[in-house]
Amino acid sequence: MASKLSSLEVTIMAMGEYQFILFPTGNIPSISEDGIEFVGDNKYNFHHAVEVLQMSPHIKNDPTSKSWKTFDDECYFLYFDGKYKVEIELNSGSISEEADDISIRTKIYRDEGNVIEALRICQVLCDSLNLKCWDIKLRKIIDLDNVSNVAATIDQYSKLRNKS
C-alpha cells in the first residue's frame, strides 16, 4: 500500500508554501513524473496524532485551512502563536484509524511563515509517531536530529523567502 501525492497536488500545495510530508518509518519515498509516493505497509495511528497535536501549545483543530470542502474537518490543525502560522493536514484529509501521511506547511512569502516552527512540529510528530520527514523543496528525507540537515532546510527556506 502506498500514500501518493501527484505532481499537481504537490505543485498546488507548494506554491508559496514550504512543505514537509511526514510518513511512517520503514516506508520508502519513490519519485516519478506523476509525483511522490511513499511505498510500504507501515501506518501511524490517526487518533494518537490528534492527541499529540491537541497537547501541543498553540495548535488547534482548524478546518478553515482544509484544501477541499469534501475533506474531513478533523484532519486539519493550525499552529498560531499570535505571529506565525503552520498548517497541519493529517492523512491527506481523510479520517482513518491507520493513516499514511501528515503534511506540514508554512508560508514562504508572508511574514506569518516560519520554517523553524514547522520543523519543531515535524520533530514532535516524528518522535511521537515514529515518522520520517520528507522536505518537498529539497526533495529528500531530512534527519531532524542532524544539525546540517536542518540547517540546509532553513537555508533553502531563507533563499526562497529572499526572492520575494
Question: Where in this protein do the model-derived segments appear?
Answer:
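Acidic (Asp/Glu-rich) sequence patches and key acidic residues
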Residues: 5-164
